[in-house]
Amino acid sequence: MLPSQAGAAAALGRGSALGGNLNRTPTGRPGGGGGTRGANGGRVPGNGAGLGQSRLEREAAAAAAPTAGALYSGSEGDSESGEEEELGAERRGLKRSLSEMELGVVVGGPEAAAAAAGGYGPVSGAVSGAKPGKKTRGRVKIKMEFIDNKLRRYTTFSKRKTGIMKKAYELSTLTGTQVLLLVASETGHVYTFATRKLQPMITSETGKALIQTCLNSPDSPPRSDPTTDQRMSATGFEEPDLTYQVSESDSSGETKDTLKPAFTVTNLPGTTSTIQTAPSTSTTMQVSSGPSFPITNYLAPVSASVSPSAVSSANGTVLKSTGSGPVSSGGLMQLPTSFTLMPGGAVAQQVPVQAIHVHQAPQQASPSRDSSTDLTQTSSSGTVTLPATIMTSSVPTTVGGHMMYPSPHAVMYAPTSGLADGSLTVLNAFSQAPSTMQVSHSQVQEPGGVPQVFLTAPSGTVQIPVSAVQLHQMAVIGQQAGSSSNLTELQVVNLDATHSTKSE
């Protein structure tokens, strides 16, 4: 039996199994029974009608025709991903389409083969070169060059802008890093993504002016600066001049129970001005990238009720009152309900052991208050971790606790959880500035004077990291009115480590 007759017999067997025609006879001629699959190099059974030769001719014609890519690429000219594919992708699509046409030749006979050759085969409903039932080409590689087509360019911008914003969010959420992303479209719109610490780069007036200045400037010609090219690369550029220090407490996530300061309130009769141990120099806050700001007054309200027993506030602070003698009237430091003096989980500064002396000055308008109260805060450990980090610049922070920063007439603070809704509290705001608003060690004795705050570190200054809050709409509380209101003097002075009074 000749090879062509063997191929025809094999074709007869397959045709009988598929079509159910047992009386079909081979009509092939020599040389036309065995077709060669050019893409795979294997032989397939011929159908006996000379279609093997025509299939070879179709394959040669498709490989030589310049429009063969349009037949198998499956991409429209105006689609968003209509750029040229890689050569390997075209060959894969061509090979898959040829094999599907051969399947039509074997199964359906000459009519199906002719229909497949004309582009109306079984895969005509879907995109050629893709899997059956899939309408798109999937992931293809496009050229990294400017898209001239305006419609395609706008579509690409919309899709990729959304994608890069999503990637920035995922990076900041998964790894806890600070991300600032700014995308300016050619239509004049600016889209941004920024984490909390980097938001003032966009929200502050200085940052907005800088961004607008850069965007409104004419496009500079390419320079020979190598760092500029590196910044425009796909991997970015590490800025060696913009490194910053990350505190250990931010990464370790220490709990609130690590340090528990003890609060002791002692009622002493008479005047206790001899315990004023703060130095007479004014205290300034040294910010690493800004000028020095004087610490203004923090005036804590004092309740007039006498409580000889321990008082527990809403935030868990225990005030223990112990009387050392007969006292006609005394005072307790009443903390705001949303303010806590206990160390928070994430803090940015640790200072040595300090004690807070709150001295209640006698008021001439209320003659019954002839005694003064001394409030002492000591710590049972070597260092006190302050949760209320004092802020003086305009960069927000995510440290735990509360944020405090000075103003001309009061000290404002806000919990970190309240920054999103713009809540900010002004403690003891005054309608006019008192006569002794400067920070010094002068003891106020004249009537109507306002006591002052002393914050003193071992070297006379307190090093505060660069951080601040956004100025939101303020809610003023604690307005002092009338001559009968009690104002206290809050002093933070240095004490030795021997002051280790423990709270029971």
Swiss-Prot record:
Glycans are attached at residues 273, 303, 305, 312, 379. Residues 1-28, 61-76, 368-381 have a biased composition (Low complexity). GO terms for molecular function: chromatin binding; chromatin DNA binding; DNA binding; DNA-binding transcription activator activity, RNA polymerase II-specific; DNA-binding transcription factor activity; DNA-binding transcription factor activity, RNA polymerase II-specific; histone deacetylase binding; primary miRNA binding. Signal peptide: none annotated. Residues 129-218 bind DNA. Disruption phenotype: Mice lacking Srf in cardiac tissue display lethal cardiac defects between 10.5 and 13.5 dpc, characterized by abnormally thin myocardium, dilated cardiac chambers, poor trabeculation and a disorganised interventricular septum. Keywords: Activator, Developmental protein, DNA-binding, Glycoprotein, Nucleus, Phosphoprotein, Transcription, Transcription regulation. Phosphorylated by PRKDC. InterPro entries: MADS-box/MEF2_TF, SRF-like_MADS-box, TF_MADSbox, TF_MADSbox_sf. GO terms for cellular component: chromatin; cytoplasm; nucleoplasm; nucleus. The modification Phosphoserine is found at residues 73, 75, 79, 81, 99, 220, 249, 431, 442. SUPFAM superfamilies: SRF-like. Residues 137-197 form the MADS-box domain. Its main location: nucleus. Residues 164-218 are annotated as: Involved in dimerization. It comes from the Eukaryota. Residues 77-87 have a biased composition (Acidic residues). This is Serum response factor.
